């Protein structure tokens, strides 16, 4: 893929991460989950398009919006 597409994907990932952090400022245990997903997005680059549904499902477990056990 082109560099510009990768930059767009990166920018969208950063924007989403900032939005999620804003919504979860009182849940410090969720920061590491967000950082891991952000790093995953950067590393996977162009493959991110296929992984978006999987990442979103990981971010929304049935029991709670964020599961601190992911960080252990």
Swiss-Prot record:
Cytoplasmic compartment spans: 24-72
Similarity remark: Belongs to the Tymovirales TGBp3 protein family.
InterPro entries: TGBp3 (IPR003411)
GO cellular component: host cell endoplasmic reticulum membrane; membrane
Subcellular location: Host endoplasmic reticulum membrane
Any Pfam family the entry gives: TGBp3
Spans within the Lumenal topological domain: 1-2
Function noted in UniProt: Plays a role in viral cell-to-cell propagation, by facilitating genome transport to neighboring plant cells through plasmosdesmata. May induce the formation of granular vesicles derived from the Endoplasmic reticulum, which align on actin filaments.
Protein name: Movement protein TGBp3
Keyword Nuclease: no
Note: TGBp1, TGBp2 and TGBp3 seem to act together for cell-to-cell propagation. TGBp1 is the main movement protein that physically cross the plasmodesma with the viral genome. TGBp2 and TGBp3 would facilitate TGBp1 function.
Signal peptide interval: none
Ranges that cross the membrane: 3-23
Disulfide cysteine pairs (residue numbers): none
Keywords: Host endoplasmic reticulum, Host membrane, Membrane, Transmembrane, Transmembrane helix, Transport, Viral movement protein
One annotated GO biological process: transport of virus in host, cell to cell
Major site of localization recorded for this protein: host cell
């Amino acid at each position: 893929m082109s560099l510009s597409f990768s930059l767009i994907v990166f920018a969208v990932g950063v924007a989403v991460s900032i939005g999620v952090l804003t919504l979860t400022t009182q849940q410090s245990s969720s920061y590491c989950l967000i950082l891991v997903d952000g790093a995953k997005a950067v590393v996977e680059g162009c493959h991110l398009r296929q992984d978006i549904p999987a990442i979103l499902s990981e971010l929304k477990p049935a029991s709670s919006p964020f599961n601190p056990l992911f960080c252990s």
